[in-house]
Amino acid sequence: MSTPNSDSPAAQAAKKVFSRLDLDGHNLPPSPAPSSPHNGRRYALATELVYTETKDQYGASSIPIYQSATFKQSSSNGGSEYDYTRSGNPTRTHLERHLAKIMNANRCLSVSSGMGALDVITRLLKPGDEVITGDDLYGGTNRLLTYLKNNQGVIVHHVDTTNVESVRQIISPKTTMVLLETPTNPLIKICDIPTIARITHEANEKAVVVVDNTMLSPMLFNPLDVGADIVYESGTKYLSGHHDIMAGVIAVNDTELGDKLYFTINATGCGLSPNDSFLLMRGVKTLAIRMEKQQANAQRIAEFLESHGFKVRYPGLKSHPQYDLHWSMARGAGAVLSFETGDVALSERIVEAARLWGISVSFGCVNSLISMPCRMSHASIDAKTRAERQMPEDIIRLCVGIEDADDLIDDLSRALVQAGAVTLTVDGFHANTAEGAAAAAAGSEAAETTTTAAPSL
């Protein structure tokens, strides 16, 4: 059989045909094809979390893991969409487009941890820039800001960001960044983000309002919708939901701002790995059902503790001083709460007596965790500063998972009794605190009223 001349019409036709086929003889679009909607969200958020619009050339129902450091180019000039995974990877691109959709963002970027995300954001600052932030911050955030203050010439103002007037008094044309958390961790205080964003931009239109949305996730709150310029989250928490990866995400609407953040990620090499991008994408799909169960459990546990006389901090309780403000912005209360016992040693005994509640830092995973922030997650903040910021040394943080609520309450009850945190009565128990005594007295009065009224029924 003769071979057609390379210049013959038959040879040219063959080249055109086979240039479109892959090694298996398939003439299909490259993988991955662009994901996420082009015209905004089209379905309910719970649906969008699952619907990824993946168009793999082989019909894979899950996004492929492109575990490759380099990508071959079609010419000596390069120019292909991907060349080196530090700069970009198809798996990471799918994740980022999907996250942008659910975070109501124009662009989303993913990095190796939540603190990595904040590090990228703070590289927008230069010596002499002024930052306003809260007095109840995650310990890692406080550590990074302290470093920038002591070593990079950045001026950091810590104020009570739950008090808009306190923020207003500090804001000036020199303000470059306002960094907010809501709810705060672990005091569960609420910031009025729309108002703070407005007064910040009025003082300096170039200032950026940054919001750490880790405590709520995109399922419950979208800060970009209420005036924030940058939103970041620890993907390790609710987005992943299983504490088997570390990740951070950054969301913006401003294209120029997004380009600056991407430049830093590419330059420093902190982009999320392909495998972790795959795992985070998998976790995001179940965010709605996990958060629904975790919130329901957290609400029951918060009500249980409060009914027995403990001072509980949780925005799902109407006793929370900023209950109305929280619900004016958010779609849920989250699954992190804290309570006080009045005694550090007592709190330590409660934490160590728990069985189902794992003693650990972090939150947002399917299993429930218990900790003393002043001993663990916020230990990097010195005792003097904690006292100045009115952070109780005895405070216990509960990060509620998806277990059976009755089991969690039973285990917590046993820990409270074993630790000596409650006084047993014929009607149950109440906390050995002023609040607990008041609750017990109210219960006794109610019982007496019921007894007196009984004969007339």
From Swiss-Prot:
Residues 1-41 are annotated as: Disordered. It is found in: Cytoplasm; Nucleus. Keywords: Amino-acid biosynthesis, Cytoplasm, Lyase, Methionine biosynthesis, Nucleus, Pyridoxal phosphate. Belongs to the trans-sulfuration enzymes family. NCBIfam families: cysta_beta_ly_E (TIGR01329). Its cofactor is pyridoxal 5'-phosphate. The keyword Cytoplasm applies. GO terms for biological process: 'de novo' L-methionine biosynthetic process; transsulfuration. This is Cystathionine beta-lyase. Pathway: Amino-acid biosynthesis; L-methionine biosynthesis via de novo pathway; L-homocysteine from L-cystathionine: step 1/1. It catalyses: L,L-cystathionine + H2O = L-homocysteine + pyruvate + NH4(+); an S-substituted L-cysteine + H2O = a thiol + pyruvate + NH4(+). SUPFAM superfamilies: PLP-dependent transferases. Its EC number is 4.4.1.13. It is an enzyme of class 4 (lyase). GO terms for cellular component: cytoplasm; nucleus. The keyword Ribosomal protein does not apply. GO terms for molecular function: carbon-sulfur lyase activity; cysteine-S-conjugate beta-lyase activity; pyridoxal phosphate binding. Involved in de novo synthesis of methionine. InterPro entries: Cys/Met-Metab_PyrdxlP-dep_enz, Cys_b_lyase_euk, Cys_met_metab_PP, PyrdxlP-dep_Trfase, PyrdxlP-dep_Trfase_major, PyrdxlP-dep_Trfase_small. Pfam families: Cys_Met_Meta_PP.
